[in-house]
């Protein structure tokens, strides 16, 4: 049996980083088309209202303009691959909207994909470790990480590291939701972080 990639030439196989850049660029193009579609709908609705053909109460019923129609009107071309990609993008967006809450609830209880233990570090050392940790997590496209900072029982004047970690995570551009797990998994001595998606809809 021939290997799955046997018919592929080596130069046709994109490195991961290049493939991700291409996907991000395509996603930006689709977002541009989506913005143009919405602008076209708004413009058509305003013109119809001015003509008296569309009462305000019926504005929501205005006909929708597809992404491909906007692309054809603007660029005057038709590409079957692009049409298929637009349809797939719309399907993924609907699926993501339906399942995002369900997926987030599931992710909240899932086991973290990486762990950083900050015990014994100063706040300055912890920030440096966190910088490296989040950079690696983003490169690996992780969705959930665990940061162990302790409860500060052995610190004079109360916990110092935990508040510092919280401020760092809240200000980090790639960090999303953060929360403490159940006591049996570390409780307030541990912070779980859901990372923001680095590649849209993927």
From Swiss-Prot:
UniProt-listed InterPro entries: Smr_dom, Smr_dom_sf
Gene3D superfamilies in UniProt: 3.30.1370.110
Domain Smr: 116-196
SUPFAM superfamilies: SMR domain-like
Domain of life the protein comes from: Bacteria
Name of the protein in question: Uncharacterized protein TP_0674
Family annotation (SMART domains): SMR
